[in-house]
């Protein structure tokens, strides 16, 4: 899988965001943000960011956060295959320094990857064609 952040790896329409907000299958709360995720049945993850003026006042800070989130997502996307992810920023996130944020996002991605339900293996009943028969 390429480690780019092309258009296909972004949530673009309000419908995509609404689907994640309405029925998230994974939820990782953090101190200053909330990470919501939903299975997307694709071979790549998609990311959407919600950083409002109420939670982070200065546009410089909002843009810095978006840049760091996208870069962290790009680096960890191999472990996030099949998720639509929305990150919702909360108050105080803009006050956190870059190195701390990078480490924080790394931990959140790992927590999200661990929260994925493990698919059950399909066992075939012992029949005529099975080696147990």
Curated annotation (Swiss-Prot):
Gene Ontology molecular function: any one: tRNA binding
One record GO biological process: tRNA 5'-leader removal
Keywords from the named record: Endonuclease, Hydrolase, Nuclease, RNA-binding, tRNA processing
Catalysed conversion reaction: Endonucleolytic cleavage of RNA, removing 5'-extranucleotides from tRNA precursor
GO cellular component: ribonuclease P complex
Listed transmembrane segments: none
Domain of life (superkingdom): Bacteria
Gene3D superfamilies: 3.30.230.10
Protein EC: 3.1.26.5
Annotated coiled-coil segments of the chain: none
Self-association state and partner proteins as the record states: Consists of a catalytic RNA component (M1 or rnpB) and a protein subunit.
HAMAP family in alphabetical order: RNase_P
Protein function: RNaseP catalyzes the removal of the 5'-leader sequence from pre-tRNA to produce the mature 5'-terminus. It can also cleave other RNA substrates such as 4.5S RNA. The protein component plays an auxiliary but essential role in vivo by binding to the 5'-leader sequence and broadening the substrate specificity of the ribozyme.
Protein family membership: Belongs to the RnpA family.
Name of the protein described by the UniProt record: Ribonuclease P protein component
Organism (species): Pseudomonas savastanoi pv. phaseolicola (strain 1448A / Race 6)
